[in-house]
Swiss-Prot record:
This is 3-dehydroquinate synthase. Its EC number is 4.2.3.4. It comes from Rhodococcus erythropolis (strain PR4 / NBRC 100887). Catalyzes the conversion of 3-deoxy-D-arabino-heptulosonate 7-phosphate (DAHP) to dehydroquinate (DHQ). SUPFAM superfamilies: Dehydroquinate synthase-like (SSF56796). CDD domains: DHQS (cd08195). One of its GO terms (biological process) is amino acid biosynthetic process. It is an enzyme of class 4 (lyase). NCBIfam families: aroB. Binds 1 divalent metal cation per subunit. Can use either Co(2+) or Zn(2+). The gene is aroB. Its cofactor is Co(2+); Zn(2+); NAD(+).
Length: 369
């Protein structure tokens, strides 16, 4: 990919997702008209944030960089409160803007802060992990975690633009790319089987940030999400398909107190959802089996603690897709044919979980992808 690619998210307030390399000039131009810009970044990205701040300052913009905690630790009400305090101190107004620089947790938190500050100010996302590029940064979902569950406090607040600089993937740990691949694979199963074909043809190339396959996977994933979000911004119907594998995945994250990466938890959730679809008579064996095989190819987990089912059931009871006290799952009726399964018999859930259950982990053990 030599020239930047623009994917338009055609909602009521349309915005571009720009995919390419060396996008600093395009990024800075996005803030024309703002007097003040707050750059919220995770700790490892201080140097990049400073480069953006300096470029904005050269244009006469009063830019500030503010460090936020890494990963899920940042998606906390206390951190949001800190961010609001900073915005107050620097005098950020509705004609100004906020920028996120980091992974999915950074986009979730920063989007939430932007949605709530003065009831909504412009936010521009610069995702730096694969997961954030193909999922969190696109679509306008924002949120923080509470004891009640993951992302239960949040808002829909669309960004003004998203800039995906592929060069940033060359600096992140390999396991970050592996974790993000869960969302890419999910997209392949619900909407674009070519994604699965590309990964299966050369798993190593699919994980190589300097090659040509990964940018293609990112573009395809973003295009799918853009179409779904344009049709159903507020997740009243179609957008639920993007939560394929997430019902169990979120419950795993909560049980692990967010020490598991999101992608690792979703990977297990995908295998569970496939088994659920198979047992419900909705999904053919070949497509169900393909879930585990392709996730194994890229090094993602496909099993979880066999003693955890009771805890996970409690976690799934808080899922946002549930209605009238009934669990609701996204399942497949075939490749790229997502549907819903409402109120499945508990015995079906037990049977599906048995397919992913493994021996309980050693005391104090955990899995960090």
């Amino acid at each position: 990919m030599t020239e930047p690619v623009r994917v338009e998210v055609k909602t009521a307030s349309p915005y571009p997702v720009v995919i390419g390399r060396g996008l600093l000039g395009d990024l800075v131009a996005e803030f024309d008209g703002a007097r003040t810009v707050a750059i919220f970044h995770q700790p490892p990205l201080a140097e990049t944030a400073e480069a953006v701040r300096a470029a904005l300052a050269e244009k006469g913009i009063d830019a500030h960089r503010i460090e936020i905690p890494d990963a899920e630790d940042g998606k906390d009400l206390a951190v949001a409160g800190f961010c609001w305090d900073v915005l107050g101190r620097i005098g950020l107004t509705r004609s100004d803007a906020i920028m996120s620089l980091g992974g999915g947790a950074a986009t979730d938190l920063t989007g939430f802060v932007a949605a709530t500050w003065m009831r909504g100010v412009k936010v521009v996302h610069v995702p730096t992990t694969l997961l954030a590029m193909v999922d969190a940064a696109v679509g306008g979902k924002t949120g923080i975690n509470t004891e009640a569950g993951k992302n239960l406090v949040g808002s829909f607040h669309e960004p003004g633009a998203v800039f995906i600089d592929l060069a940033t993937l060359e600096t992140v740990p390999h396991n970050e790319i592996v974790a993000g691949m869960a969302e890419v694979i999910k997209t392949g199963f619900i909407a674009d089987p070519v994604i699965l074909d590309l990964i299966e043809a050369d798993p190593k190339a699919a994980l190589d940030p300097s090659g040509t396959v990964l940018p293609e996977l990112i573009r395809r994933s973003v295009e799918v999400k853009a179409k779904v979000v344009a049709a159903d911004l507020r997740e009243s119907d179609l957008r639920e398909i993007l939560n394929y594998g997430h019902t169990l995945g979120h419950a795993i994250e909560r049980r692990e107190r967010y020490k598991w990466r999101h992608g690792a938890a979703v990977s297990v959730g995908l295998v569970f959802a496939a088994e659920l679809g198979r047992l419900a008579g909705r999904l053919d064996d070949a497509t169900a089996d393909r879930h585990k095989s392709i996730l194994d190819l890229v090094g993602l987990p496909t099993s979880y603690d066999g003693d955890a089912f009771g805890d996970l059931m409690k976690g799934m009871q808080t899922d946002k897709k549930n209605r009238a006290g009934l669990l609701r799952f996204v399942v497949l009726d075939g490749l790229a044919k997502p549907g819903r399964l409402e109120g499945p018999d508990p015995s079906l859930l037990v049977a599906a979980y048995s397919a992913i259950a493994r021996d309980p982990r050693p005391a104090g053990g955990t899995v960090l992808l």
